[in-house]
Amino acid sequence: CDWSSDVCSSDLILLLNATQITEEPEEGKPSTFGQCLALLGKPFILLSFLGIMCHVGIDVGTNTTAPKILMERLGMTLADAGFATSLYFIFRTAGCFLGAFILQKMAAKTFFAISVLCMLAAMFGLFVFQDQAMIYVCIALIGFGNSNVFPIIFSQAMLYMPDKKNEVSGLMIMGLFGGTIFPLAMGVASDAVGQSGAVAVMLVGVLYLMFYTWRIKK
């Protein structure tokens, strides 16, 4: 699917721009799949892995759900409602760009909390708003809020186990693809109660990220 490659590409580009990397000579053998999965036994690494899954779930979910919300509540055509996806990526891209500068001046934990609060407010807004402009504001907030979640979680995981950089990075990348399970749950929820059900699934992901905020080091 095109969206999966877009999600991975944008996150990896953001990571490379936002993270300072000191190259060191490679030592030992390349990490195996089993060695990466074994790190899930470490509580913080598991929390980080789940956090990245939530990030991807929110990202993919917003792209698929936002246009449907406009169509369901405002009777817009698919062509017109498709602007919601573009709006999301505009603010996500802007957030990626600004985040690289903000993280130089602000603690990662503080910025992560602000980002999650933006998404939390937006999710509640998507439950209640029927106005086109306000729905667009919510979509923009999700785009900005979700733009720096991946690099912050990734860096926190790397700092937690600096001696296992290869394994940790491999596991976090796996989380990008693991997050694709969210659309399945969202599809079931939307079939049952409409697009508000899909928003509820994304809200669970945002609430988890709120919980993860307290585990981030300053």
Residue ranges and their predicted role:
Residues S147-P162:
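Intracellular juxtamembrane helix-capping segments at the cytosolic ends
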Residues G95-A108, S190-D191:
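Helix-to-loop junctions at the C-terminal end of transmembrane segments
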